[in-house]
């Protein structure tokens, strides 16, 4: 196994694990870091699909007790039934819009201006959502109504726009629609499970021809590093938001958006070969 490729896989796995569940756009970070490391092409595309599985498993493991409780309580527990209904309801809009518009959006909007604009605008909205005075309608995910869940589901559709960030769209949407920070964050994590599984399965099918068994060691390094770092990140974020706002992430989004514009203007990143 090539040592340099193993190092690239390790670094990108760490980047994915750090950024997937923070509202700062994992796609944008993987593009920038991947280009700086010279990790592009078909192998890179397949690699990004595989390491998402590591992130999915990390959040499922972190919430395994709740997931198991919901599964076991589906037949008789009203709380588990309501939670599952809300989750599926929030999941549907992304499926419909994704199947209908994902390829068009990828073709027309995957460019540095769109990515940077989405990062900056998302950061500004996040600052506004944190500063505005509003009544909390749901302190926990169990307090959510189906209407709140559906609203967050539609907010998740904005993540189809490159640079928006799936977690960013759902967390910001949750805050805007009246969820507490804790509820918005946890619901974002739970909604990530079906959404990312569906997106990964779709991507695996779409890019099935470029998956090679010879790349398995590289994929394994990225997968494991993503899983470990994502699990640490999820735990750290839940502790952080208990006593802090999302303002630091908002300012980071704005700064990173400006970095994206700079890399484009100065031709530091080859956006013509970048893949979402």
UniProtKB/Swiss-Prot annotation:
<dbReference type="Pfam" id="PF02673">
    <property type="entry name" value="BacA"/>
</dbReference>
<keyword id="KW-0378">Hydrolase</keyword>
<keyword id="KW-1003">Cell membrane</keyword>
<feature type="transmembrane region" description="Helical">
    <location>
        <begin position="108"/>
        <end position="128"/>
    </location>
</feature>
<feature type="transmembrane region" description="Helical">
    <location>
        <begin position="85"/>
        <end position="105"/>
    </location>
</feature>
<keyword id="KW-0812">Transmembrane</keyword>
<keyword id="KW-0046">Antibiotic resistance</keyword>
<dbReference type="GO" id="GO:0005886">
    <property type="term" value="C:plasma membrane"/>
</dbReference>
<feature type="transmembrane region" description="Helical">
    <location>
        <begin position="249"/>
        <end position="269"/>
    </location>
</feature>
<feature type="transmembrane region" description="Helical">
    <location>
        <begin position="185"/>
        <end position="205"/>
    </location>
</feature>
<dbReference type="GO" id="GO:0071555">
    <property type="term" value="P:cell wall organization"/>
</dbReference>
<feature type="transmembrane region" description="Helical">
    <location>
        <begin position="218"/>
        <end position="238"/>
    </location>
</feature>
<comment type="function">
    <text>Catalyzes the dephosphorylation of undecaprenyl diphosphate (UPP). Confers resistance to bacitracin.</text>
</comment>
<dbReference type="GO" id="GO:0050380">
    <property type="term" value="F:undecaprenyl-diphosphatase activity"/>
</dbReference>
<protein>
    <recommendedName>
        <fullName>Undecaprenyl-diphosphatase</fullName>
        <ecNumber>3.6.1.27</ecNumber>
    </recommendedName>
</protein>
<dbReference type="GO" id="GO:0009252">
    <property type="term" value="P:peptidoglycan biosynthetic process"/>
</dbReference>
<keyword id="KW-1133">Transmembrane helix</keyword>
<dbReference type="GO" id="GO:0046677">
    <property type="term" value="P:response to antibiotic"/>
</dbReference>
<comment type="similarity">
    <text>Belongs to the UppP family.</text>
</comment>
<keyword id="KW-0997">Cell inner membrane</keyword>
<keyword id="KW-0573">Peptidoglycan synthesis</keyword>
<keyword id="KW-0961">Cell wall biogenesis/degradation</keyword>
<keyword id="KW-0472">Membrane</keyword>
<dbReference type="GO" id="GO:0008360">
    <property type="term" value="P:regulation of cell shape"/>
</dbReference>
<feature type="transmembrane region" description="Helical">
    <location>
        <begin position="43"/>
        <end position="63"/>
    </location>
</feature>
<feature type="transmembrane region" description="Helical">
    <location>
        <begin position="12"/>
        <end position="34"/>
    </location>
</feature>
<dbReference type="InterPro" id="IPR003824">
    <property type="entry name" value="UppP"/>
</dbReference>
<keyword id="KW-0133">Cell shape</keyword>
